[in-house]
Curated annotation (Swiss-Prot):
This is Methylglyoxal reductase DkgB. It is found in: Cytoplasm. Monomer. Keywords: Cytoplasm, NADP, Oxidoreductase. The lineage of its organism: Bacteria, Pseudomonadati, Pseudomonadota, Gammaproteobacteria, Enterobacterales. Aldo-keto reductase that significantly contributes to cellular methylglyoxal detoxification by catalyzing the NADPH-dependent conversion of methylglyoxal to acetol. GO terms for molecular function: aldo-keto reductase (NADPH) activity; methylglyoxal reductase (NADPH) (acetol producing) activity. Its main location: cytoplasm. One of its GO terms (biological process) is L-ascorbic acid biosynthetic process.
Length: 267
């Protein structure tokens, strides 16, 4: 099963806000939803999905294992808890949200526990998030590249993460981009605005289309119906070589997500 190119993110959305966002998105035609244990919204996402009436087999649900649940005795029980909250027997994709700080739990231990969850049918696919090249090497050594469906990383026009992307691609690991719009900062960029005007599109559509054109999956979030609908249209926008070169030139290694005590030594 391939990871959908386009999905809904739910980071920082909770309770009624996330329920409304997910229900609206599903109504508009979204079929992939990304959540995580630490977002504290899995139960709300599960409720929204249940109330939407969309059949489970049409959906692609992703969750992520938090660092406190990485040890082999905690990972599977924590995932079962997530499934209960999400009101489903399985998720389509489970990611390791962040590598274990200070290597408290080895990559080998948590990747093998995650692979066991896959063997038990709790998750269809497994993957990683916020992994550097040395960490990807360890993950591959633990479970094989064939078992790593994606590396979900911060990736925007300002942080194009080429080194990690190229290494992942060379080893057959798909990339999912989060923070694709750089917290909305990239929406104000003059270069993006120019490309948007040229295509009669919005800046958000241009950035999402650029990322998908590079082969990445995207998971933008919004609480507004018009933005959710507008973002969907990015799938129909195709940028030309001139546009792509202009966006490539915006890369300035501007990383926005690097929590102290959690972030690895970035490549």
């Amino acid at each position: 099963m391939t990871i959908p190119a386009f999905g809904l993110g739910t980071f920082r959305l909770k309770d009624d806000v996330v329920i409304a966002s997910v229900k609206t998105a599903l109504e508009l035609g979204y079929r992939a939803v990304d959540t995580a244990q630490i977002y504290d919204n899995e139960a709300a996402v599960g409720q929204a999905i249940a109330e939407s009436g969309v059949p489970r087999n049409e959906l692609y649900i992703t969750t992520k294992i938090w660092i406190e649940n990485l040890s082999k005795d905690k990972l599977i029980p924590s995932l079962k808890e997530s499934l209960k909250k999400l009101r489903t027997d399985y998720v389509d994709l489970t990611l390791i949200h962040w590598p274990s700080p200070g290597d408290a739990v080895s990559v080998e231990e948590f990747m093998q526990a995650l692979l066991e969850a896959k063997k038990q049918g709790l998750t269809r696919e497994i993957g990683i998030s916020n992994f550097t090249i040395p960490l990807m090497e360890k993950a591959i050594a633990a479970v094989g590249a064939d078992n790593i469906a994606t590396n979900q990383i911060e990736l925007s026009p300002y942080l194009q993460n080429r080194k990690v992307v190229d290494w992942a691609k060379a080893h057959g690991i798909h990339i999912t981009s989060y923070m694709t719009l750089a917290y909305g900062k990239a929406l104000k960029d003059e270069v993006i605005a120019r490309i948007a005007a040229k295509h009669n599109a919005t800046p958000a559509q241009v950035i999402l289309a650029w990322a998908m054109g590079e082969g990445y999956s995207v998971i933008p979030s919004s609480t507004r119906r018009e933005n959710l609908a507008s973002s969907l249209l990015a799938q129909d926008l195709h940028l030309d070589a001139e546009d792509k070169n202009a966006i490539a030139a915006l890369d300035c290694n501007d990383r926005l997500v690097s929590p102290e005590g959690l972030a690895p030594a970035w490549d």
